[in-house]
Protein backbone atom coordinates (compact mmCIF):
# COMPACT_ATOMS: atom_id res chain seq x y z
CA UNK A 1 0.00 0.00 0.00
CA UNK A 2 1.30 3.45 -0.85
CA UNK A 3 2.72 5.23 2.20
CA UNK A 4 0.67 8.43 1.92
CA UNK A 5 -2.52 6.43 1.30
CA UNK A 6 -1.93 4.35 4.44
CA UNK A 7 -1.19 7.45 6.50
CA UNK A 8 -4.21 9.33 5.12
CA UNK A 9 -6.58 6.46 5.87
CA UNK A 10 -5.41 6.30 9.47
CA UNK A 11 -5.53 10.08 9.96
CA UNK A 12 -9.10 10.18 8.60
CA UNK A 13 -10.14 7.91 11.50
CA UNK A 14 -8.61 10.14 14.19
CA UNK A 15 -9.71 13.61 15.28
CA UNK A 16 -7.22 15.28 17.68
CA UNK A 17 -3.88 16.77 16.67
CA UNK A 18 -1.16 18.11 18.98
CA UNK A 19 1.12 20.74 17.47
CA UNK A 20 3.95 22.82 18.85
CA UNK A 21 5.29 26.22 17.85
CA UNK A 22 8.29 28.21 19.00
CA UNK A 23 9.04 31.89 19.13
CA UNK A 24 12.28 33.41 20.34
CA UNK A 25 13.30 30.15 22.00
CA UNK A 26 9.98 29.63 23.78
CA UNK A 27 8.01 26.46 22.95
CA UNK A 28 4.26 25.89 23.32
CA UNK A 29 1.97 23.01 22.34
CA UNK A 30 -1.77 22.85 21.78
CA UNK A 31 -4.46 20.30 20.91
CA UNK A 32 -7.45 20.64 18.62
CA UNK A 33 -9.98 18.65 16.66
CA UNK A 34 -8.86 18.52 13.04
CA UNK A 35 -10.13 17.89 9.56
CA UNK A 36 -7.52 16.14 7.40
CA UNK A 37 -7.35 16.95 3.68
CA UNK A 38 -5.59 14.04 1.97
CA UNK A 39 -5.23 15.95 -1.33
CA UNK A 40 -3.43 18.89 0.25
CA UNK A 41 -1.84 16.78 3.02
CA UNK A 42 -2.97 19.31 5.60
CA UNK A 43 -4.92 19.58 8.83
CA UNK A 44 -7.57 22.26 9.32
CA UNK A 45 -8.23 23.44 12.85
CA UNK A 46 -10.07 26.23 14.64
CA UNK A 47 -8.29 28.23 17.32
CA UNK A 48 -8.77 31.74 18.67
CA UNK A 49 -6.17 34.39 17.83
CA UNK A 50 -5.82 35.33 21.50
CA UNK A 51 -4.42 31.90 22.45
CA UNK A 52 -0.74 31.62 23.29
CA UNK A 53 -0.06 29.25 20.40
CA UNK A 54 -1.85 31.49 17.87
CA UNK A 55 0.02 34.55 19.13
CA UNK A 56 3.31 32.68 18.76
CA UNK A 57 2.34 31.48 15.27
CA UNK A 58 1.55 34.92 13.89
CA UNK A 59 0.35 34.77 10.29
CA UNK A 60 2.48 31.64 9.73
CA UNK A 61 5.10 29.59 11.56
CA UNK A 62 6.97 26.31 11.56
CA UNK A 63 5.27 23.55 13.55
CA UNK A 64 5.87 19.98 14.68
CA UNK A 65 3.35 17.66 16.23
CA UNK A 66 1.68 14.31 16.68
CA UNK A 67 -1.54 12.39 16.24
CA UNK A 68 -1.89 9.20 18.22
CA UNK A 69 -4.46 6.75 19.47
CA UNK A 70 -4.67 5.40 23.00
CA UNK A 71 -3.99 1.65 22.65
CA UNK A 72 -3.84 -0.61 25.66
CA UNK A 73 -0.93 -2.69 24.33
CA UNK A 74 2.37 -1.90 22.59
CA UNK A 75 1.45 -4.19 19.69
CA UNK A 76 -1.41 -1.85 18.75
CA UNK A 77 0.51 1.45 18.83
CA UNK A 78 -0.11 3.63 15.79
CA UNK A 79 0.75 7.29 15.48
CA UNK A 80 2.06 10.12 13.37
CA UNK A 81 4.87 12.57 14.01
CA UNK A 82 5.07 15.51 11.63
CA UNK A 83 6.64 18.82 10.80
CA UNK A 84 5.26 21.54 8.60
CA UNK A 85 3.87 25.06 8.63
CA UNK A 86 0.80 26.61 10.23
CA UNK A 87 -0.96 29.63 8.79
CA UNK A 88 -4.22 31.43 9.36
CA UNK A 89 -6.58 31.21 6.39
CA UNK A 90 -8.41 34.23 5.03
CA UNK A 91 -11.28 34.94 2.64
CA UNK A 92 -12.64 32.24 0.34
CA UNK A 93 -9.94 29.78 1.38
CA UNK A 94 -11.10 30.12 5.00
CA UNK A 95 -14.78 29.86 4.02
CA UNK A 96 -14.26 26.62 2.09
CA UNK A 97 -12.20 25.04 4.86
CA UNK A 98 -14.77 26.08 7.50
CA UNK A 99 -17.63 24.48 5.54
CA UNK A 100 -15.72 21.20 5.32
CA UNK A 101 -14.74 21.42 9.01
CA UNK A 102 -18.35 22.06 10.04
CA UNK A 103 -19.49 18.99 8.09
CA UNK A 104 -17.10 16.85 10.13
CA UNK A 105 -17.78 18.64 13.44
CA UNK A 106 -21.30 20.17 13.34
CA UNK A 107 -20.91 21.68 16.83
CA UNK A 108 -18.20 23.95 15.35
CA UNK A 109 -20.93 25.96 13.60
CA UNK A 110 -21.35 27.77 16.92
CA UNK A 111 -17.68 28.85 17.00
CA UNK A 112 -16.27 31.98 15.44
CA UNK A 113 -12.58 31.07 15.84
CA UNK A 114 -10.42 31.54 12.73
CA UNK A 115 -9.51 28.56 10.54
CA UNK A 116 -5.86 27.56 10.41
CA UNK A 117 -4.08 25.19 8.05
CA UNK A 118 -1.22 22.96 9.15
CA UNK A 119 0.54 21.98 5.92
CA UNK A 120 2.52 18.79 6.46
CA UNK A 121 5.97 18.61 4.89
CA UNK A 122 7.24 15.46 6.63
CA UNK A 123 5.29 12.60 8.20
CA UNK A 124 6.56 9.57 10.10
CA UNK A 125 3.85 6.96 10.71
CA UNK A 126 4.55 4.25 13.27
CA UNK A 127 2.26 1.22 12.93
CA UNK A 128 3.05 -1.65 15.28
CA UNK A 129 0.06 -3.59 13.92
CA UNK A 130 2.29 -4.31 10.88
CA UNK A 131 5.19 -5.44 13.08
CA UNK A 132 6.94 -3.96 16.10
CA UNK A 133 8.53 -0.62 15.24
CA UNK A 134 7.21 -0.53 11.64
CA UNK A 135 7.64 3.00 10.31
CA UNK A 136 6.60 4.71 7.09
CA UNK A 137 7.98 8.11 6.08
CA UNK A 138 6.56 10.63 3.60
CA UNK A 139 8.34 13.83 2.51
CA UNK A 140 6.46 16.50 0.52
CA UNK A 141 9.26 18.17 -1.42
CA UNK A 142 11.18 15.11 -2.54
CA UNK A 143 8.14 12.94 -3.17
CA UNK A 144 10.04 10.35 -1.16
CA UNK A 145 8.22 7.50 0.48
CA UNK A 146 10.05 5.05 2.71
CA UNK A 147 8.63 1.90 4.24
Curated annotation (Swiss-Prot):
Residues annotated as signal peptide: none
Its taxonomic placement starts with: Bacteria, Pseudomonadati, Pseudomonadota, Gammaproteobacteria, Enterobacterales
User: Which Gene3D superfamilies is this protein grouped with?
Assistant: Electron Transport, Fmn-binding Protein, Chain A
What top-level branch of life does the organism fall under?
A: Bacteria
Instruction: Tell me its family.
Output: Belongs to the UPF0306 family.
User: By what name is this protein known?
Assistant: UPF0306 protein YhbP
Its source organism is: Escherichia coli O8 (strain IAI1)
Chain's gene name: yhbP
Amino acid sequence: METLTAISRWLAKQHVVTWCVQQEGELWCANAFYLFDAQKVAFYILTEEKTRHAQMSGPQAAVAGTVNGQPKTVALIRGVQFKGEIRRLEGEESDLARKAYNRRFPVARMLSAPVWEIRLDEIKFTDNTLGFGKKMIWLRDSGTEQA
